[in-house]
Amino acid sequence: MGLLTVTGTPLPDPNDLDEDGDDAVRRSAGVGESSRASRHWWDRNADEYQDEHGEFLGDDRFTWCPEGLDEADARLLGDLAGRTVLEIGAGAAQCSRWLAARGARPVALDISYRQLQHSRRIDLARGAAPVPVVQADAAVLPFADAAFDLACSAYGAVPFSADTSALMREVHRVLRPGGRWVFSVTHPIRWAFPDEPGVEGLTAVSSYFDRTPYVEEDEQGHATYVEHHRTIGDRVRELVAAGFRLVDLVEPEWPEGHEQDWGGWSPLRGRLIPGTAIFVAERG
């Protein structure tokens, strides 16, 4: 499969990486620009992300969303023992470790080398066999046809890809017939609201139907972060066009007793409007 070996050398100092500005605009952003921005942003911010969210994510927890829905309870992937699983946008491969502990054979893919270094760091600290990892763009998967039984992504890759139709086709290509593809994204309705956890995040200020990307730029106007919006209907049509059958669409409710904010996700907003959409599809 062309698996990438990530060394156990110390992680580079974040101060050695370029500092990008964060002026936010709404404008078009193509495939190449989006991919470059995503790779650079995650390389630059992986340390902070893992430090801030590492306790919630754990080293080997499979959680689908800030609402805290775990695969152990949801069982959206079905039977795992002996199944080959591709985790897309894996970050530090926490989900893949959970899958491996249940008898699956996962491969963790991410566009960010720095995120994959964190995966290696966790493996070394645990003294466990390393999770196989691959650095690649999710829209150009470096695997043979029908290489996997299952594919999954917990908030990884899909929102950052400019051409998610191509991404869906690639996932379809590498899955075996009947293979399940499950991915979670920010619920599309959230696009209409400010990304704020408080009351200011409860008033719609943008059109749900405006698909213009959200782009953060540096002083030269180069994209440093890009996120793409699709409506629920867009996602369904992408899946069907790629050859999938939609099995379920899960909108996790905010659970009682869960009081932890995650960016714009909060108990206040989560109890009023959905924050996550999980698409469950099967390859035809």
Predicted region positions:
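Conserved class I S-adenosyl-L-methionine
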Residues: G2-A81, Q94-C95, R180-V215
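Short alpha-helix
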Residues: V215, V226-L249
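A short acidic, Gly/Pro-enriched loop at the edge of an enzyme's catalytic core
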Residues: A139-L150
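Class I SAM-dependent methyltransferase SAM/SAH-binding core
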Residues: T84-V140
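C-terminal lobe and adjacent flexible extensions of AdoMet/dcAdoMet transferase-like proteins
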Residues: E238-G284
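A short SAM/SAH-binding and catalytic strip from SAM-dependent methyltransferases
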Residues: D149-S165
